[in-house]
Amino acid sequence: MVGGALLVALLQNVGVSVPVLLLGIAAVGLLAALWIGKTMPTNAFHDFLAILLRGFYRLEVRGGENLDRAGPNAIIALNHVSFLDGAVALSILKKEPVFAVDHAFAQRWWVRPILKLTRAMALNPARPLATRTLIHAVSNGETLVIFPEGRITVTGGLMKVYDGAALIGEKSGAMIVPVRIEGLEATIFSRLSRAQVRRRWLPRVRVTVLEPVRLEVDNALKGKARRQAAGAMLYQIMSDLIFRTTPTDRTVIDAVVDAAKIQGWRRIAVEDPVTGKLSYRKLVVGARVLAGRFTALAGEGEAVGVMLPNANGAAVTLLGMMSAGRVPAMINFTAGPTNILAACTAAAVRTIVTSRSFVERARLEKLVGSLAEVVRIVYLEDLRQTISLVDKVRALLACRHALVPRSADDPAAILFTSGSEGTPKGVMLSHRNLLCNAAQAAARIDFGRTDKVFNTLPVFHAFGLTVGLVLPLVSGVPVFLYPSPLHYRVVPELVYGANATILFGTDTFLSGYARAAHPYDFRSVRYVLAGAEPVKEATRRLWAEKFGLRILEGYGVTETAPALALNTPMFNRFGTVGRLLPGIEAKLVPVEGMEEGGRLYVSGPNVMLGYLKANQPGILVPPEDGWHDTGDVVTIDREGYVTIKGRAKRFAKIGGEMISLASVESLASELWPDAQSAVVAEPDPRRGERLVLVTEKEDATRAAFQAYAKAKGASDLMAPAEVMVVDKLPVLGSGKADLVSVTGLVMGRQRVAAA
């Protein structure tokens, strides 16, 4: 410092002016800064970006140690949400990487100066040589930063993943490090509109780095098939990234509150045709108010029955139960008193909450009277009369927190199996189960603030509860709840009036809507998602021809909260139920007599806590070793698509050959698309078993079925030995055939000669 002062004094004595002196000092300082930057062990530009991002966006990095585990020639695969993603990548890497940049993007005038500050190579799908150059760079020890989507997202979700990006990883043999960036999508640097995202100037940015993985493609695949397989694997890695980095270590009520904070408390959460719209604030405050009354109905962690239709009141009641630390047991009011009481016994339910107006409108007085002899009936109308202004004010002040704190692994809800094959069992689902399944679905389907869900599936059904209510609530997507899926003329009109973009249903319901609807009623709908039963070809064709919409068929079971597999706009194959969702492991156990496929067992974070059975009331029976036996026989092809062959219990052994009853029913639905049919197997002394087809088709005959099956190339063994015509096939609330009742019809009939 003294030396510098003497030097300045000397220069002034020889006549150097102050401006020139200051300019010289600045030049020396700049040279010193450049020299320090060159000699520093870390990259000064990277450090500068890190300082800016940490200062303005409070950048938080999780799992940074996984970058070191990947080795020197790793491929860093990031989701692409904004123009700042490249700066984020530079700030978290110690080594100077090579950026794979889209060729067209790299040619833009304002991009060129930025690329000069980094090492970048253009990735041009039309020029294989560019891909080979990148493969060579990685093989020689370079770290490659790549955005597999090839463009900034305009949906808010994961977009198309290019095969070329996967080919680099597969050919180079390098480890792929999945990285997710969250927060920047809300800034002005993203390509999402204000309608798609709630804009924030300086949101917190979180970067999550997962464990490195290696692409391993089947050696038998060559050429285009190998390239596509690598692309599908990279998409799987990226969708797993989205799922695993979605918060699920919380309760459903906490997730709804978090959604309200992000999306806005005034945003519409739920809507029904009777009570209108409820904002997140009204929904959460209402739940907190009711929670104070629900605590008196049962002890903490105990089950309370909920018997309500799809309506705002059901959503408020469910969240209120969760806030109170009580477990809502969803009662299927279409199941009849015997099955309902068996369900109450299994779940140790002593109190059922319902609505007096609902009971009157649905004409359930007789059912409620039967239930009241065994369990206590509590009406919401009576509870509301006990709520004071003070209670409402307290709830408003405390609505951001549950009344009784619970953890993610505590029970959140009890659903009951359909009872289509026997006595209903209780299925205990945790908060983590529900939130994980919602996150699994959200990782594959792009939807957001501009969407609106229309849900007619009852909340006592796993599909209706998780996908139709919990998923939109925790995602900030408004949901329109309608109490009956059977109003085929009303539902299309309401979808049209609500401008709904996503519709859930079963084949039975979707077929009814399509027949009754005007061709313009579903003009706003983007996605039609079907589950619970196979989608018939006639239904699929009707929706495509009349509305220009394809039905995305999925598959799930109550025990997995429920979704397991789903066709998506990117990966869709008719005749299958799509590919398994992220986070789900599957194994197939061979079935005697079946040449391909096997009995499906699944494991994952969405698998239930366990069963509750009527012969062991209140005792939880967890799945063995975390694996659930779905009871379904399936095949999974090389590309991961799942095809349902039928229920393991619903195969008949005829003449030593296994025949799927579901396949016979499928043929019947194709032959008589306007009539519902079901097949029952009964003992036969000569051939082991015989098939009885029960159908609503008035003029159905065995000869007509046999001729159609032969024309379709089906086995002669699939022809039923007998056709039984009924006025109305017994069905469950989900629209599926009530197989217990159908079997009862067959067993109780007078045997008639086969037609």
Positions of predicted regions on the chain:
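Non-catalytic C-terminal accessory region of glycerolipid acyltransferases
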Residues: 14, 22-34, 40-41, 68, ...
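Conserved pre-ATP/AMP-binding loop-to-beta segment of ANL
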Residues: 264, 378-416, 422-423, 446-452
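Conserved AMP-binding/adenylate-forming core of the ANL superfamily
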Residues: 268-298, 302-319, 336-341, 391-395, ...
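Structural core segment of the AMP-binding/adenylate-forming
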Residues: 296, 323-390, 499, 697-701
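AMP-binding/adenylate-forming catalytic core of the ANL superfamily
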Residues: 352, 598, 604, 609-610, ...
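Conserved C-terminal "lid"/linker of ANL adenylate-forming enzymes
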Residues: 376-381, 652, 680-683, 692-694, ...
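Conserved AMP-binding/adenylation subdomain of ANL enzymes
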Residues: 435-452, 460-501, 516
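Gly/Ser/Thr-rich phosphate-binding loop
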Residues: 500-505, 514-573, 585-587
